[in-house]
């Protein structure tokens, strides 16, 4: 068993907000491993979730989802702050549901509006400003209309702004916040990719009779 030093106990106390004796016991139970001791304290309901606020969310799961028929596939990374939460069934269920959401949203390309490149936003603005239905509008009115249209367009492209497929009254962002509050630590979708069978490929059309003839060596 590793030696449980006063320095180690102090470090765990600062990280979790738990009492000295609880920290010492947690470290003994986990052979001096700080991360495992933190999980042990949280499992016992002793650690303060508030102490985790400044911790970077580097734990979590990468989930895959293949839609029925194998024509659509998704990979998504969802992060949390501790391995303890990453193993939680509620967290696992969230990640699975997010993957299914992405599969159901072909227009979604980004996690949030903040991820959309400035160049794209400026291009959309330029297109909207040049539309004929705005040509006779005063500049300030035109600007407001364009901002509204762009805002709507950007939300269509972002995962966080999508209505949750299992409850249309809430967005994915609200679902993430609810789960984060339930688990007591920060939860965030970091990245995802969506695959569609044959996407980007030009399907070659052929005459079935000619194809059979070619395969059998007949003309």
From Swiss-Prot:
GO cellular component: cytoplasm
Record's keyword terms, sorted: Cytoplasm, Elongation factor, Protein biosynthesis
Pfam families according to UniProt: EF_TS
Annotated region (Involved in Mg(2+) ion dislocation from EF-Tu), positions in chain: 82-85
Record keyword Glycoprotein present: no
Source organism, top-level taxon: Bacteria
Main location per the UniProt record: cytoplasm
Cellular localisation: Cytoplasm
Keyword Cytoplasm: yes
Record InterPro entries: EF-Ts_dimer_sf, Transl_elong_EFTs/EF1B, Transl_elong_EFTs/EF1B_dimer, Transl_elong_Ts_CS, UBA-like_sf
GO terms for MF: translation elongation factor activity
HAMAP family, sorted: EF_Ts
Role description: Associates with the EF-Tu.GDP complex and induces the exchange of GDP to GTP. It remains bound to the aminoacyl-tRNA.EF-Tu.GTP complex up to the GTP hydrolysis stage on the ribosome.
PANTHER family membership: ELONGATION FACTOR TS, POLYPROTEIN OF EF-TS, CHLOROPLASTIC
Family to which the UniProt record says this protein belongs: Belongs to the EF-Ts family.
Stated name of the protein: Elongation factor Ts
Species in which this protein is naturally found: Trichodesmium erythraeum (strain IMS101)
């Amino acid at each position: 068993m590793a030696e449980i030093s006063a320095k180690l106990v102090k470090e765990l106390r600062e990280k979790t907000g738990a009492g000295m004796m609880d920290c010492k016991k947690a470290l003994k139970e986990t052979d001096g491993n700080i991360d495992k001791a933190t999980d042990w304290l949280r499992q016992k309901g002793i650690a303060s979730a508030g102490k985790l606020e400044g911790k970077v969310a580097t734990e979590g799961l990468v989930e895959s989802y293949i839609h029925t028929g194998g024509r659509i596939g998704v990979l998504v990374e969802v992060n949390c702050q501790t391995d303890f939460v990453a193993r939680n069934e509620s967290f696992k269920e969230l990640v699975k549901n997010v993957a299914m959401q992405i599969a159901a949203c072909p227009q979604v390309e980004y996690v949030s509006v903040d991820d959309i490149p400035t160049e794209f936003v400026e291009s959309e603005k330029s297109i909207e400003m040049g539309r004929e239905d705005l040509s006779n509008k005063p500049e300030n009115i035109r600007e407001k209309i364009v901002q509204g249209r762009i805002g709507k367009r950007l939300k269509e492209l972002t995962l966080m702004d999508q209505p949750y497929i299992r409850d249309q009254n809430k967005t994915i962002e609200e679902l993430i916040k609810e789960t984060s509050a339930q688990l007591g630590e920060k939860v965030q979708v970091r990245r995802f990719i969506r695959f569609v069978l044959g996407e980007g490929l030009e399907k070659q059309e052929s005459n079935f009779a000619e194809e059979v003839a070619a395969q059998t060596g007949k003309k």
